[in-house]
């Protein structure tokens, strides 16, 4: 997984298995935890791309693109904690599916709340400091 690759973190309702088969990895990864916990863990080792404005995105509520649900707020807090974009971009449902199919991998979480689906674009890891 390199600079510019996408990682999808999805809720239990997302068609993760079928979408994951179309990704670079080709298989689904699972972490049975709430979305915000998974995002926090991932972002502790996965830098967000600072060269683009869409390095962090959320699936938008159908018909309500500006609606921010609690799960989205929780994940936004984790993104903001690592200096990521605030707010995350809103991605229309079917556009999100298409972005997910082109991703490196999909992680399905144990998140049962609706619209707990997020896309993250990988940045670069700098050299070790001496």
What kind of region is each of these model predictions?
Residues 3, 40-51, 77-84, 123:
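Generic secondary-structure signature for well-ordered alpha-helical cores
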Residues 5-8, 28, 49-59, 86-88, ...:
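Structural motif
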């Amino acid at each position: 997984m390199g600079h510019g690759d996408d990682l999808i973190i999805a809720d239990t309702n997302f068609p993760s298995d079928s979408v994951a088969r179309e990704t670079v990895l080709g298989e689904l990864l699972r972490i049975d935890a709430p979305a915000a916990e998974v995002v926090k863990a991932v972002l502790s080792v996965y830098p967000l791309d600072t060269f683009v404005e869409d390095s962090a995105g959320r699936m938008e509520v159908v018909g309500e693109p500006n609606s921010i649900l609690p799960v989205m707020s929780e994940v936004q807090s984790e993104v903001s904690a690592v200096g990521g974009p605030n707010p995350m971009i809103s991605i229309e449902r079917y556009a999100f599916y298409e972005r997910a199919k082109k991703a490196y991998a999909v992680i399905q979480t144990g998140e049962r709340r609706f619209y707990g689906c997020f896309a993250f674009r990988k940045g670069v890891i700098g050299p070790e400091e001496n």
